[in-house]
């Protein structure tokens, strides 16, 4: 999530209404249940596809003291045009260099170095690294834990009278609706990068949210808050090294910085600068390291290797970043209709759409967010017509929800921009933050007008509760169904 203005926890119940009995155990239990389902999908369905072990191969290279993956097949060096998809087909398939980046006679992973660096200790200690499906599973579970922590913070600081089941339902939505559960069930190298990006962005956001309780205030001892902000900033920077699209999370840092400046008051300039450095400094430092690594490998601080990939088409001539790609890709990410199957569970991912890439829009197996995560619709319906009243009583929460929604939406735009093809794993970059924003909107609006019954929700809130629970059940069922092998 993002920055919030410091405020005491808001009680939204009438004085004569008994507080709901707290069963806080239901929240970690829900998170644990999500992780168990992730593990089941990873063990029963996931596959470590041949040619997708580029993270492990890069980690092994770093452990040996270099960045490039060795050896380079002699056949690749002798090709007149090593990037031509027809000429390099046999080498790509037979010599296990599919989707690696090739520049100046060296092979590299076409990804950032965050995951390989995390794997280096395993390489040094055991001479090997976990398979991609394990990396994906562990990272996804860490992301769910961080999302649960974020939602618990929201309740403690702003909506302290929320029943525990509502927070648990929000955790279930983030974990089981949308693409992340499906990503775990695939568990290849690209999915590992997506899952690590999810884990790091959620953890960074949670740390930043926690830091805002006193960061920028007049409290004389803010060292712990600065440490949390610095850790969150660094973790968001590392997320960029896992998924370059996560650079958009700099929006969260900008919101935090704005809050710090807004709270300045009579504080000395040196104190303000120290707070701002804690928020932005680590992200910038990590970003510089990423840029240097990119420049060393690919000659440009912004090139992660996609422009040099040995792929099913020539990436050196691929027309990247066309406006014409946005609309069809976004339509797929949001509204791709699931495919039909003749037996239980009767639905599956929409099949691959092929074509003459890149002139024709293509798609990997897909399902749109409105089908796999209909709680997003409930969150939007809750937030848009609610007016200012609910947010005026919890301005910090409104800031956080807006920052999460904006960042998630921009992530969907960013993944729709480079290539004329859509993929479910691309959707997973922005969906978690959108789900957090939807949950925040639901929890805020449903708590705005309590009843004397002690349910913590007004009449409109109870309707929202029913809508959320129905949408949650549908989203979980659909997301589970599309994982069943055909």
Language-model features and meaning:
Residues 2-486:
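Membrane-proximal envelope and lipid/glycan-remodeling enzymes
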């Amino acid at each position: 999530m993002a920055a919030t203005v410091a405020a005491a926890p808001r009680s939204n119940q009438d004085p004569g209404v008994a507080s709901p009995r707290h069963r806080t155990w239901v929240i970690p239990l829900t998170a644990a249940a999500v992780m168990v389902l992730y593990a089941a999908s990873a063990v029963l369905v996931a596959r470590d596809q041949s040619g997708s072990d580029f993270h492990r191969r890069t980690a092994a290279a770093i452990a040996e003291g270099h960045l490039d993956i060795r050896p380079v097949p002699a056949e690749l060096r002798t090709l007149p045009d090593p990037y031509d998809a027809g000429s390099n087909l046999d080498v790509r398939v037979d010599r296990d260099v599919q989707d690696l980046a090739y520049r100046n006679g060296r092979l590299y992973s076409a990804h950032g170095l965050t995951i390989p660096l995390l794997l280096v200790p395993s390489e040094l200690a055991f001479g090997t690294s976990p398979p991609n499906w394990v990396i994906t599973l562990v990272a996804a579970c860490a992301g769910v834990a961080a999302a649960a922590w974020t939602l618990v913070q929201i309740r403690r600081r702003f909506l302290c009278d929320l029943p525990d089941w509502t927070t648990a339902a929000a955790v279930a939505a983030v974990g089981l609706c949308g693409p992340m559960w499906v990503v775990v069930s695939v568990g290849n190298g690209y999915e590992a990068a997506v899952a690590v990006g999810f884990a790091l962005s959620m953890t960074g956001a949670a740390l930043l949210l926690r830091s805002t309780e006193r960061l920028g205030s007049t409290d004389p001892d803010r060292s712990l808050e600065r440490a949390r902000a610095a850790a969150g900033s660094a973790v968001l920077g590392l997320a960029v090294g896992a998924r370059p699209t996560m650079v958009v999370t700099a929006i969260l840092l900008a919101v935090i910085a704005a809050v710090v400046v807004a709270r300045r008051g009579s504080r000395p300039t040196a104190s303000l600068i120290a707070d701002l450095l804690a928020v932005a400094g680590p992200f910038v430092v990590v970003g510089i390291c990423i840029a240097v690594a990119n420049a060393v490998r690919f000659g440009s601080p912004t090139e992660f290797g996609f422009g040099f990939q040995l792929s099913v088409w020539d990436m050196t001539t691929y027309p990247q970043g066309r406006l014409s790609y946005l609309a069809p890709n976004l339509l797929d990410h949001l509204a791709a209709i699931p495919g039909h199957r003749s037996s239980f569970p009767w639905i599956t991912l929409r099949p691959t759409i092929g074509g003459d890439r890149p002139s024709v829009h293509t798609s990997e197996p897909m399902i749109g967010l409105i089908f796999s995560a209909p709680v997003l619709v409930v969150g939007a319906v809750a937030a848009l017509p609610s007016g200012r009243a609910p947010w005026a009583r919890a301005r910090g929460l409104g800031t956080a929800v807006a920052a999460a929604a904006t960042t998630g939406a921009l992530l969907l735009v960013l993944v729709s921009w480079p290539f004329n093809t859509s993929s479910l794993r691309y959707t997973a970059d922005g969906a978690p933050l959108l789900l957090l924003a939807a949950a925040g909107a639901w929890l805020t609006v449903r708590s705005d007008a309590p009843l004397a019954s002690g349910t913590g929700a007004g009449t409109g809130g109870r309707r929202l509760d029913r809508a959320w629970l129905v949408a949650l059940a549908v989203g979980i069922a659909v997301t589970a169904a599309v994982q069943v092998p055909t």
